[in-house]
């Protein structure tokens, strides 16, 4: 710290540690951790971002001895700190460090796929630098189990972001085949779930593959610019042309027309509409 005249006071040699890339606690490690158990996570973040030295074994010993104190922290504070950790450079360094990885998984066991960041190719790394917390979290928690549900139950995430994560989770819980990512199939997903959800499932696949896939990249570019698909037949049209009264029947007819339109790659003829309405 410095006084009002700018004179530096450094009783713990912090300046020297900073110059040497050594991350340590100011004062007694055990005492500082017990003052605020969130400092365990902050240590991991600072170590991942600034350290040029290996962990001090005594520091790690104190971190592990106090790990149960994390349970005393609010979920909001834990999530806020996780958001600060969820930067691509931090995640990459953390996931490559065995000790840091072990500790963060004790605190956030739901981050099952965090090691994905240890081996990113250049293209994926550059892409993820531009991405947001929700997509990064999805990469870490989506698997074939109920892991996502547990994470969303445990932490207070907005309804909108919960839906976004669940869209990715639900998509990849289905059986993935060679036809999953053809344009006809993705068009249907785009229609029902929208642009953001479609780009999420495509980019998720690209990151998991961790290699250049030209067809997937072309799909991403296509759906970044694709206009929304709008069903051409409306209730007013059916009421006027076919004299169908407003109510349950018109809803049923519209649903069947929509299903036919989607099935036919978003095309439907007048004859097909006639057939559905008159049967």
Show where each model-derived region lies:
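C-terminal subdomains that position terminal phosphate/3'-OH groups for nucleotidyl transfer/ligation
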Residues: 100-279
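Glycine- and charge-enriched loop/helix tracts that form the active or gating conduit
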Residues: 1-148, 153, 248-249, 253, ...
């Amino acid at each position: 710290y410095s006084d009002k005249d700018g004179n530096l006071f450094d009783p713990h040699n912090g300046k020297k540690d900073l110059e040497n890339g050594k991350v340590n606690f100011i004062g007694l490690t055990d005492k500082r951790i017990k003052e605020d158990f969130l400092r365990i996570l902050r240590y991991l973040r600072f170590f991942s971002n600034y350290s040029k030295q290996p962990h001090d074994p005594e520091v790690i010993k104190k971190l592990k001895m106090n790990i149960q104190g994390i349970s005393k922290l609010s979920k909001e504070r834990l999530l806020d700190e996780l958001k600060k950790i969820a930067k691509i450079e931090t995640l990459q360094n953390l996931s490559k460090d065995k000790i840091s990885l072990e500790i963060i998984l004790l605190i956030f066991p739901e981050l099952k796929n965090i090691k994905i960041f240890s081996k990113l190719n250049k293209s994926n790394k550059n892409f993820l630098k531009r991405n947001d917390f929700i997509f990064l979290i999805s990469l870490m928690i989506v698997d074939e189990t109920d892991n996502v549900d547990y994470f969303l139950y445990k932490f207070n995430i907005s309804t909108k972001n919960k839906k976004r994560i669940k869209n990715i989770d639900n998509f990849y819980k289905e059986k993935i085949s060679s036809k999953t990512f053809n344009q006809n199939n993705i068009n249907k997903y785009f229609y029902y779930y929208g642009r953001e959800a479609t780009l999420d499932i495509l980019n998720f696949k690209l990151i998991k593959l961790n290699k250049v896939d030209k067809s997937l990249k072309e799909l991403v570019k296509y759906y970044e610019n694709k206009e929304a698909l709008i069903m051409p037949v409306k209730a007013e049209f059916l009421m006027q042309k076919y004299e169908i009264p407003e109510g349950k029947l018109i809803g049923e007819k519209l649903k069947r027309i929509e299903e036919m339109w989607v099935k036919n790659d978003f095309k439907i003829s007048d004859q097909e509409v006639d057939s559905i309405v008159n049967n």
